């Protein structure tokens, strides 16, 4: 089996290559992932958009469809090793651990076209930590040829075996500096379920259909809490357009949450 680490270079929203970021323990993300990957015994390779020099000493598979995202990486891996299943890992999985990878490998179903974990919020299969059997990876090129680059839709079309995560936050990713701060807070403080009251301003109430709710969250920061709410409710509202408050006091997005507290979200310039 190939274990393919996705590496795409500079992230537009993060502003840098996430694999080169230094974790709270002082280790680069790419070195952490490479260590986890090698411990599985799989043939570890690095996906790149081109044949540029990799940030770590791993063999490279260059995308055959530049700009095609993870599906392009999967298609390239299949072309390079057409007889091998592919375990694909996203580069921004800062909370991934050895136990999660072992669980995926131990519960793989070769009779299905893929095996994946369910997203902890919406239950849909996660494409960036999944095993694609040859019968599944061989179909990626066809999707790319049609101009369909949606990795999650592709994975769902394979009707994968879907597993529950043994560590609920293990696949929480980071696409922005706020989300990175949330991941690092989880690494430093641990992942613990907490209950909060969330209240919404009139404008948000009209969108969500409720003024207040009690929620259980794994978030450590205000940004992490909003990301869970945004994902669950499919909100198209950026943090730049919101203000979070505690007892009438404005909160920074990386401020740490406290159990049983009340957080108010208000649209900037709104009510």
How should these model regions be labeled?
Residues 1-135, 141-148, 156-170, 178, ...:
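Nucleotide and nucleotide-moiety/phosphate-recognizing core
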Residues 188-271:
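Ubiquitin-like/PB1-type beta-grasp interaction modules and other compact soluble beta-rich domains
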Residues 146-150, 221-224:
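Short, charged, surface-exposed loops that flank catalytic or proteolytic processing sites
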Residues 23, 139-140, 183, 207:
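Residues that scaffold the ATP/ADP-binding catalytic core of kinase and kinase-like folds
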Residues 168-191:
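Glycine-rich phosphate/pyrophosphate-binding loop and the adjoining helix
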């Amino acid at each position: 089996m190939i274990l393919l680490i996705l590496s795409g270079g500079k992230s537009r929203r993060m502003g840098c290559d996430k694999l080169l970021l230094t974790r709270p323990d002082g280790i680069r993300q790419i070195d952490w992932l490479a260590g986890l990957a090698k411990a599985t015994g799989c043939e570890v390779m690095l996906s790149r958009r081109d044949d540029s020099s990799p940030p770590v000493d791993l063999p490279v598979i260059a995308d055959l469809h530049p700009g095609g995202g993870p599906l392009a990486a999967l298609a390239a891996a299949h072309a390079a090793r057409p007889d091998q299943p592919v375990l694909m890992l996203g580069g921004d999985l800062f909370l991934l651990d050895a136990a999660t990878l072992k669980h995926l490998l131990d519960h793989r179903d070769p009779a299905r076209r893929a095996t994946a974990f369910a997203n902890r919020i919406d239950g849909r299969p996660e494409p960036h930590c999944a095993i694609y059997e040859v019968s599944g990876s061989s179909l990626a090129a066809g999707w790319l040829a049609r101009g369909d680059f949606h990795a999650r839709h592709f994975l769902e079309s394979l009707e994968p075996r879907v597993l529950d995560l043994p560590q609920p936050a293990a696949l929480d990713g980071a696409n922005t500096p706020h989300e990175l701060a949330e991941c690092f807070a989880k690494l430093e403080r641990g992942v613990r379920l907490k209950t909060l009251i969330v209240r919404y301003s009139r404008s948000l109430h009209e969108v969500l259909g409720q003024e207040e709710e009690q929620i259980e969250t794994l978030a450590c920061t205000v940004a992490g809490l909003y990301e869970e709410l945004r994902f669950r409710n499919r909100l198209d509202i950026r943090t730049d357009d919101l203000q979070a408050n505690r007892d009438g006091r404005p909160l920074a997005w990386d401020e740490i949450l406290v159990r049983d507290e009340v957080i108010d979200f208000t649209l900037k310039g709104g009510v």
